């Protein structure tokens, strides 16, 4: 069963020039978001730009959050990443979805009208309460070993 999430169209080109975000295959986890811009953007090396997707969403379910993720091809082929690496959309946010993109390459990158620039997925949300303790009851094998504790190979 699919959950319903309200979407509000902010750009009148949807349905004419652009499609609503959609799953491309039955196994797709994410839906692509498009650059709803009025003119092409030349993203210079080491430059960041904020781009409209042309939509607002209203998740309206406190058990679901949205995540904005990069498109792997943009990063691998062109060095274009999300400047905040992952964008979190809280269940009670109702504003426009904006994408902050960073060109980490040494070449200019052209963002055209309607380009697919990021993807959105929806995930279950678990809110927690902190339980303050003096020590952990069950000690794991890993304990407090972090950053690189398992080696390189």
From Swiss-Prot:
Transmembrane segments: none annotated. Pfam families: dUTPase. It catalyses: dUTP + H2O = dUMP + diphosphate + H(+). Substrate binds at residues 71-73, 84, 88-90, 98. InterPro entries: dUTPase, dUTPase-like, dUTPase-like_sf, dUTPase_trimeric. Pathway: Pyrimidine metabolism; dUMP biosynthesis; dUMP from dCTP (dUTP route): step 2/2. It is an enzyme of class 3 (hydrolase). GO terms for biological process: dUMP biosynthetic process; dUTP catabolic process. One of its GO terms (molecular function) is magnesium ion binding. Keywords: Hydrolase, Magnesium, Metal-binding, Nucleotide metabolism. Its cofactor is Mg(2+). Its EC number is 3.6.1.23. Gene3D superfamilies: 2.70.40.10. Belongs to the dUTPase family. This enzyme is involved in nucleotide metabolism: it produces dUMP, the immediate precursor of thymidine nucleotides and it decreases the intracellular concentration of dUTP so that uracil cannot be incorporated into DNA. This is Deoxyuridine 5'-triphosphate nucleotidohydrolase. It comes from Wigglesworthia glossinidia brevipalpis.
């Amino acid at each position: 069963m699919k959950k319903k999430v309200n979407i509000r169209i902010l750009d009148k080109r949807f349905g004419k020039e652009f499609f609503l975000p959609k799953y491309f295959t039955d196994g797709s986890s994410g839906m692509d978001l498009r650059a709803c811009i009025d003119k092409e953007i030349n993203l210079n090396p080491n430059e960041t730009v904020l781009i409209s997707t042309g939509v607002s969403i209203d998740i309206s379910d406190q058990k679901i959050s949205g995540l904005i993720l990069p498109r792997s091809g943009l990063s691998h082929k062109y060095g274009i990443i999300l400047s905040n690496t992952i964008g979190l959309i809280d269940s009670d946010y109702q504003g426009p979805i904006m994408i902050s993109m960073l060109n980490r390459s040494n070449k200019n990158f052209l963002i055209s009208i309607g380009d697919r620039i990021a993807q959105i997925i929806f995930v279950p949300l678990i809110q927690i309460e902190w339980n303050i303790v003096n020590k952990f009851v069950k000690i794991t094998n890993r304990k407090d070993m972090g950053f690189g504790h398992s080696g390189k190979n």
